[in-house]
């Protein structure tokens, strides 16, 4: 959609171009050894259907079928994952009414489990709060790292409280920390 306001953050709506550009870009950023001092880790963003929102409105809802999601919006991410991207950033948008930042079906079931992504799933800038979600919803959906730029003083204690209260299992935190450390090391 040419009215989409964040076209500068994408390779375009052509699936072949997404796949054509994703791998070389990631290889250029990460090189043969992402830990080498001259290289940086690549983040594939914005997962998923970020450019398919109704009327091209930024941070809106994408009303699409499962078939369209997989055919038009997934291939670039599959290529990015196969090319070794160390992280994937969630989209501010919603898919069929469900905010991506709070979607276990998209972030855990599809991205982590089905596609086998073992890197870090991170929020966009204050993405959980801006999506009207809680830290708990983000954690349960599969967010590993939160960009709590303005709200970190509340977010960090909230994560501790959720674990201590048994609302989020320690195994979920262990998984997130493992992914973050794998990326850093």
Predicted regions and their residues:
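Glycoside hydrolase catalytic-domain context in secreted enzymes
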Residues: 1-185
């Amino acid at each position: 959609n040419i009215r989409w306001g964040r076209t500068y953050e994408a390779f375009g709506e052509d699936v072949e171009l997404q796949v054509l550009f994703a791998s070389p870009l990631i290889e250029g950023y990460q090189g043969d050894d992402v830990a080498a001092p001259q290289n940086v880790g690549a983040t594939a963003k914005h997962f998923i259907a970020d450019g398919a929102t109704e009327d091209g409105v930024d941070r809106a809802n994408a009303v699409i079928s499962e078939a369209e999601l997989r055919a038009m919006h997934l291939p670039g991410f599959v290529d990015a994952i196969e090319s070794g991207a160390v992280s994937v950033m969630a989209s501010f948008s919603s898919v069929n009414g469900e905010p991506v930042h709070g979607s276990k079906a998209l972030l855990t079931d599809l991205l982590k489990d089905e596609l086998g992504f073992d890197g870090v799933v991170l929020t966009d800038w204050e993405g959980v709060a801006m999506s009207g979600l809680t830290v708990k919803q983000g954690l349960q959906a599969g967010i590993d790292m939160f960009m709590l730029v303005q709200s970190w003083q509340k977010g960090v204690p909230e994560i501790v409280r959720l674990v201590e209260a048994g609302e989020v299992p320690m195994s979920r935190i262990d998984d997130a920390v493992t992914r973050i450390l794998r990326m850093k090391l």
